[in-house]
Amino acid sequence: DPEMSRGLGDVYKRQGICNRLDRNTSGIVAAGKTMNGLQKLSAHFKDRTLNKYYICIVKGEITKRQLVNGYLKKDHSCNRVTIYKQLPDDILSDKNMPANDKNTDKSEYMPIETEYVPVVSNGRITLLKIHLITGRSHQIRAHLASLSHPLAGDYKYGDASFNQYFADKYFCRNQMLHSYEIDIPDMNIHVHTDIPASFINVLKGEQIWQPGIPEVLEALH
């Protein structure tokens, strides 16, 4: 709804909020208490001179740290993004690409970079800490889904049977994605949240919760 979007945008501006989260994503939202603080914070978000970390629960087992790159293209008509591994030139010359996409402006393919490290896994699921290097719309959700590791509870990019399992067993209705930590070295700012109770409930239910996980998450960068 364009009118609602404009209204929400006005609210964000009035409250001095610098970043937005995907709908149903929990966690840290940064805001400036003063105009000077807001300007400094906003500049760091714009210039990407800060580090943003998320935690999420995904399908399958991930055993090692990965830095993955690609390109993201958003379809505004349905508020959904598609991830491509290839460069735009390669995509636009691909014979298998849908005809209605062949004349798409290359600038619509935005470069993305996502780093993730596994914290704990039982083979069925993995708890990840994500370093969101670029901050595109739906980036974490779509990028991991494209790698066959969709987020639990993600009804836009996820796996239907996997989501149903979490809905039935853990009453999970939203994607298990949480903005966990922000680090701004230039401003000597480092903040992180507690692990959400919904995450702990799942990890305990899957018998992989360990008391030392909060300390592990804090140490991983």
Outline where the language-model segments fall:
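Short phosphate-engaging motifs
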Residues: G37, K64, R136, S198-F199
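Pseudouridine synthases involved in rRNA/tRNA modification
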Residues: L92-K106, M110, I133, R141-H221
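Glycine- and acidic-residue-rich catalytic/RNA-contacting loop of pseudouridine synthases
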Residues: R6, L38-K40, V58-T126, A142
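Short, solvent-exposed secondary-structure boundary/capping segments
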Residues: R124-I130, L203
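Residue-level signal for inorganic ion chemistry
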Residues: A30, C56, Y116, I140, ...
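Glycine/acidic-rich beta-strand-loop module
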Residues: K13-K46, Q139
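Single conserved hydrophobic/aromatic residue that forms the stacking wall/gate
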Residues: D1-Y12
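A generic structural signal for short beta-strands and their flanking turns/coil linkers
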Residues: L50-Y54, V68, I112-T114, T126, ...
